[in-house]
Amino acid sequence: MPEGNKIDLSGDGGVLKEILKEGTGTETPHSGCTVSLHYTGRLVDGTEFDSSLSRNEPFEFSLGKGNVIKAFDMGVATMKLGERCFLTCAPNYAYGAAGSPPAIPPDATLIFELEMLGWKGEDLSPNQDGSIDRTILEASDKKRTPSDGAFVKAHISGSFEGRVFEDRDVEFDYGEGKAIGIIDGVEIALEKMNVGETSRIKIQAKYAFGAKGNEEFKIPPNATVEYTVKLVDCGKGLEEWKLSDEERLAEAKVYKEKGTNYFKKENWALAIKMYTKCKNILPTTVHTNEEVKKIKVATHSNIALCHQKSNDHFEAKQECNEVLALDKNNVKALYRRGQCNLTINELEDALEDFQKVIQLEPGNKAAANQVIICKQKLKESKNKEKKLYANMFTKLAANDKETEPPRETDVLSKCGEWSEEDAKREAELTLERDNIIMI
């Protein structure tokens, strides 16, 4: 039972800690970490009521999330790697007046012997797959975190296998870090950090430099990197719910301009992000307002072009559909959708789009050229189908001939024999019969 120097963790004598063996290093786990430890729990009379050692299996839990008794969260947060300690827990920091029958009686003071085996950082990845792992090195009690669009000031230091490849101060608007080379994993982590906090972030490839790596930093493909990040300061993001329709319209124009600036720099991802913010913040109570409609048409059209530039033709087509829902005779959207349909081999739809452009603009040479291309591709497709049917009939005829019983030779033996020309002719007739000829 504990008898040595005790540390009052709760400040009221409710949680007392006595170190039996000092741990190594200076780091301790923080809220959100997955902690692994061994414990033995006893009543004050020495009666053992539970032990992970008897199960020969470490106990794991998420620290600071209320998954264990209060004393456990408080005590474990102070332990270093390899440390052993006693933790004396008053009832109000354990199981209280109810206890936990039958092993723990009401109003019981408990004594735990703990051994810290290790911990994993907090998983900040969007899909909770461990791809962004944070360990807080220096905590902060300032409850200010960045939100979308807020000004951010930070210091970042990136390393790979112990080699530092970048170390710099950065300032940017949250959500636009890509513009100055901030990888996604760092920006995602910053959203969870308090001003003044320093954290170590382990980031897997999909939120770092991906399958391509980074030649400048000598980062190979699919590499996991590590960043030490300090959030120096941050502003306050836009509170959209407080905005009037006029203010929403003004902010939409700001985002639209940002999108255009990123487009000019060929930063398609950020351009799409800004254009999307533009259309999302537009006022919804003035649907008939021509200025709002004009901005919507422009942003959907610009997003479509960005997706085209990124070779994402399905998304580009969807954005063109949005434009045409607002303006059915929008020539740019029709032409662009025609290009998307042509690329994804929706030839009939592409032809229809380009022909509609010519109806609206009879002198549109670009659309006329695309019509010629569509018709040529449709003709090639038709010929391929004809050959396919011809091959099918030829194979069927050959199979029939192989299985036909021997017959006596006569002068009419050649009559009705299936030739390759017959197969082609039958294929053409079948196509016409099934109404699948494409013109």
UniProtKB/Swiss-Prot annotation:
EC numbers for this chain: 5.2.1.8
Gene Ontology molecular function, alphabetical: FK506 binding; peptidyl-prolyl cis-trans isomerase activity
EC category name: isomerase
Keywords from the named record: Isomerase, Repeat, Rotamase, Sensory transduction, TPR repeat, Vision
Catalysed transformations (reactions): [protein]-peptidylproline (omega=180) = [protein]-peptidylproline (omega=0)
Protein's name in the database: FK506-binding protein 59
TPR repeat ranges per the UniProt record: 252-285, 297-330, 331-364
Tissue-level expression: Expression in the embryo is limited to three tissues: lymph glands, Garland cells and oenocyte cells.
One cellular-component annotation, GO: inaD signaling complex
Quaternary data: Interacts with inaD and trpl, and may be part of the inaD signaling complex.
Record bears the keyword Transcription regulation: no
Organism of derivation: Drosophila melanogaster
Pfam families: FKBP_C, TPR_1
Domain PPIase FKBP-type: 32-120, 149-235
PROSITE patterns xrefs: FKBP_PPIASE, TPR, TPR_REGION
Signal peptide: none
Purpose: May have a role in phototransduction; inhibits or prevents Ca(2+) induced stimulation of the trpl ion channel.
Biological processes per GO annotation: chaperone-mediated protein folding; detection of light stimulus involved in visual perception; regulation of calcium ion transport
Record-linked InterPro entries: FKBP4/5/8-like, PPIase_dom_sf, PPIase_FKBP_dom, TPR-like_helical_dom_sf, TPR_rpt
PANTHER family assigned: PEPTIDYLPROLYL ISOMERASE
